[in-house]
Amino acid sequence: MPLRLDIKRKLAQRSERVKSVDLHPTEPWILSSLYSGSVCIWNYQTQTMVKSFEVTELPVRSSKFIARKQWIVAGADDMFIRVYNYNTMDKVKVFEAHTDYIRCVAVHPTQPFVLSSSDDMLIKLWDWDKGWMCTQIFEGHSHYVMQVTFNPKDTNTFASASLDRTVKVWSLGSPDPNFTLDGHSKGVNCVDYFTGGDRPYLITGSDDQTAKVWDYQTKSCVQTLEGHAHNVSAVCFHPELPITLTGSEDGTVRLWHSTTYRLENTLNYGLERVWALGYMKGSRRVVIGYDEGTIMIKIGREVPVASMDSSGKIIWSKHNEIQTVNIKTIGADNEIADGERLPLAVKELGTCDLYPQSLRHNPNGRFVVVCGDGEYIIYTALAWRNRSFGSALEFVWSVDGEYAVRESTSRIKIYSKNFQERKSIRPPFSAERIFGGVLLAMCTNDFICFHDWAEGRMIRRIDVNVKNLYWADSGDLVTIASDTSFYILKYNRDVVSSHLDGGGSVGEEGVEDAFELLHEINERIRTGLWVGDCFIYNNSSSRLNYCVGGEVTTLFHLDRQMYLLGYLANQSRVYLIDKQFNVVGYTLLLTMIEYKTLVMRGDFDRANALLPSIPKEQHDSVARFLESQGMLEEALEIATDSNYRFDLAVQLGRLEVAKAIAIEAQSESKWRQLGELAMSTGKLDMAEECLLHAMDLSGLLLLYSSLGDAEGLTKLTSMAKEQGKNNVAFLCFFMLGKLEECLQLLIESNRIPEAALMSRSYLPSKVPEIVTLWKKDLQKVNPKAAESLADPDEYPNLFEDWQIALNVEANVAPKRGIYPPAEEYIIHAERPNETLVEAFKSMHIHLEEVLPDENGDDTHEAIEENGVEESQEDAVEVDVEADGSTDGAVLVNGNDTEEQWGTNNEESSA
């Protein structure tokens, strides 16, 4: 059966002809050598060019990263080797290396050595610690030396491929080859070593259109790979997968199974001839260099093939090798921090006859199934003995140890615990995936169908695109994960049982009430598992979360891609593994999970009994869970964080509790928030206290002015002046009728023009004094403008009704500060909207008229016109209303509807 490996294109960049490619070991970079003479670095994550080096005008046939030095080394047709620092782009070294075209450069993995091969038929060894001195020359080939590569298992040896139709293996320090492999009928273009530990192989590609796999210990050809229609120009063994890649001038890259040598896939991206292949150990990415650009592909998923049983024993596969570790070997004395790599001793368990693509313990942990290459093998977990095998594209366990295999899209077989076939199902649709658990599930790209294990009867069809399925141990809850979200459903097994036992018919949709949707959460799951009624998962944003009752809590932020292994209740820790098989653990208290589960079930008595066993530092997390369930009172009782308790108290309207927290915290923001809440609920005494604590002068101004509290306004005036809040102080003075203080405040604030305009409207007698100050101040900036200012003492003709305004001011000044009762507002509001000067001039001043009240309302004081002559030179007497009330701030001249805060332009001249 073929390997089921997804191949995804990760980068496609068009360029000049690419002669070699290399991958950086730590950065997301591809190094491409171009026939045009340039070397480019591409970032395959951002799909952009990072750097470009103009090396020469002739082709650059090979370049490599030297990551430990931050260098790149390049060999070109001008016979020079050049070394660049890829960070600074400085040229580190340039030297003539050969007498003909340089075909290849290879970097030693640990030593300061670089090998170069050339059309001069020589191989040279260069030592950069010795100033790039040539320390050795290897002679023996009789034609161009096309490629050299170090043996990763024995870095003291290397192989060379030549157009003399041979491959030679050399040792550093010896001028003669160790041996020669001769088998191709035409020149050999490329060579690569097998990186795995079990086979001493190398592969060669030739102009005879074949690739050959050699055993360099027996010096024999193991396999010849035929199928290309042109010269084979690039070959490699994939470092992580059981595949061999060959690239040809026919424009294709062929993928061969490394064990069976079966052709698995053929890739053709339409970029003409293939010249180079690049890979990196530990990665599934492969780079291909073409005539017209560079392609990067990713083969398969980088998910570690591993499984953990309920006791903490982990089994994983590295290639065909099976290894095991046991978390219990870490004693209680070793305190491992959350997220820290566990120091586990790896034990070799055995090997597998097929390449594992999935590995899973059965529910009781006795058996482990390995599935891959279209087959499955069931092993014993302890001794790794083969118990059963067969054909399968997929394998799943039931909760009681039975299992099912998907042989094809149209056939699923169910087996008993004794490994005997019990039932065969032919679904009426194309089954692309199957899932195990309480029910056997089969799905297409559009829907999933659940079947019972006993008879294979359909239980329910759900229309959703399923990527994974997770059953809770209780069998009552199941998570369906899709591309963008996941759904938590309740399985009503009693409803299903009664329906089936009663002989009820099952339609195309199954039993209608079999499942009940509880929650939908818009997160993409990477891996997940159930612990009780708690669903633990890590998402695409590298967060480790858990979900209880639809409430999602983030446990930790992961620093890399991790995959869940399982949860050990006796340690209260959840374990994860990365693709390098590093195991880490994170604490997740079982008591916390149990508490939340009991709350969701409505068992509050047992939940409260469990609460003391939860550490105090976790109580806020418990409170947030209760808040999410609408249980604010209970959350307030449990919460410990003062900020959080304050927020809860405010939500509940528990002002006394919030006040106690605010007193303890002495937080200005808390006092302000509490003051606003108290004001909105009518608790004005508390509001005043809170606003005073918060020093919220604007809030106090609103409160005192609304209450008509003159004493409060007086107190607020002092506070505002002390804090430099002149706007608040001005309004307080104005409402109190202290117009002289208003003017003085404007003058002190250097707002002299505004002071002049205000005095013209409210205190005409102060105008000459302020105009003098204004002239003096303006003289410093614009003397001409200062001279243009008119003083009413000198030019009374420029100020309309000036004398009347002075007389009215003198009459009403002693009456300021006397306030009418609030109950008379309606009477005052109905008075004519007319200034005193206008009233005098129109001779319609009546006793009932009143002046504006102390707080600046648009009402008028009563003025009587008894005995007033028409002459403006005569004294004007303005009487007050019978109740003695006057306005605190009298608009003597001008329209009161045009009052401004500190300014009024009515009838003032300059």
From Swiss-Prot:
InterPro entries: Beta-prop_COPA/B_2nd, Coatomer_complex_subunit, COPB2, G-protein_beta_WD-40_rep, Haem_d1_sf, TPR_COPA_B, WD40/YVTN_repeat-like_dom_sf, WD40_repeat_dom_sf
SMART domains reported in the protein's UniProt record: WD40 (SM00320)
Organism: Oryza sativa subsp. japonica (Rice)
GO cellular component, one term: Golgi membrane
Signal peptide: none
Subunit structure: Oligomeric complex that consists of at least the alpha, beta, beta', gamma, delta, epsilon and zeta subunits.
UniProt keyword annotation of Protein transport present: yes
Cited Pfam families: B-prop_COPA_B_2nd, TPR_COPA_B, WD40
Phylogenetic classification of the source organism: Eukaryota, Viridiplantae, Streptophyta, Embryophyta, Tracheophyta
Protein origin, superkingdom: Eukaryota
Protein name, entry field: Coatomer subunit beta'-2
Annotated membrane topology: Peripheral membrane protein
